[in-house]
Amino acid sequence: MKFSVIAAILLFSVFAASAETVYTVDCNGGGDFRTIQECFDALPSKPSEWRTVRIMPGTYREKVTLDVYKDKVRILGDEMAETRIVWGDYAGKVVDGRELTTYDSYTMSVRADEVCLDCLTVENDAGRVGQAVALETRGDRIHLYHCALIGDQDTFFARGYVSRVHVENCHIEGTTDFIFGPSIVLFECSTIHCKAD
C-alpha cells in the first residue's frame, strides 16, 4: 500500500511538471482572450516549455502575427471547418496611407520557431485582386496538420530562407502561384487544389 501511494505521488509529480500552459481564445467571450492576436501578444518570449493556444470554434476576422521568439507553440483549433482565421489584405491595398505589398498582405504570419498549427483554416478572402497571402511562415520547424489554407494568388508563402515546414493532411487552394517561397517544405497526404486553369 505504501509503495502504491509513493508511486502515485511520483507519477502525479512527473505529470504536473510536464503539464504545459494552455491559453484559450474564444470570440464569444468564454476564454482567456477574445482575439488570437491578444493571446499571441501575451505569450512570454523565449520559452523553455511548450504552450498550447486553444482556439474555440468561430470565425476570427483578424490579421495575426506570431512574432519572433514566441517559439514552442501549439495552435489548436476545433476542426478545420469550424475554426477559421480570415482577413482580406492584398498587394496594392492602401492601409493607413501606405500601400501594401505581397510581403504584408498575409492573414497569418508565423515568425517563431517550433510551431504546430492543427485543425484550423487560414483564409485570405480578398478575391482575385492580385497577391493576397493567407499564411506566411518564416520560422523553422513549422508543422501544419489537418489545416486548410484558402486564397487565390499567393495563398501559402513559405518565406523563411532557412526554414523547414511540414504540411500533413492539409488542404491548400488558390489560383496563381499559390504555393511559393524559398523554404524547404514537405507535403504529405495533402490536397492541392487549383481553382483556375
Describe every region a protein language model picked out.
Residues S4-F15:
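Sec-dependent N-terminal signal peptides
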Residues S13-D41:
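Right-handed parallel beta-helix/beta-solenoid
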Residues E20, S48-R51:
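Loop/turn elements at helix/coil->beta-strand transitions in domains of secreted/extracellular proteins
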Residues C27-G29, R34, W50-T52, D71-Q131:
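Right-handed parallel beta-helix/beta-spiral solenoid domain characteristic of secreted/periplasmic
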Residues N28, M56-G58, C170:
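Active-site-proximal beta-strand/loop segments in catalytic clefts of secreted hydrolases
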Residues R34-S45, R61-K70, I75, R111, ...:
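Short, T/G/N/S-enriched strand-turn elements that build extracellular solenoid repeat scaffolds
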Residues G58-E62, M80:
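Short active-site-proximal "capping" loops at secondary-structure junctions
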Residues S109-D197:
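Right-handed parallel beta-helix
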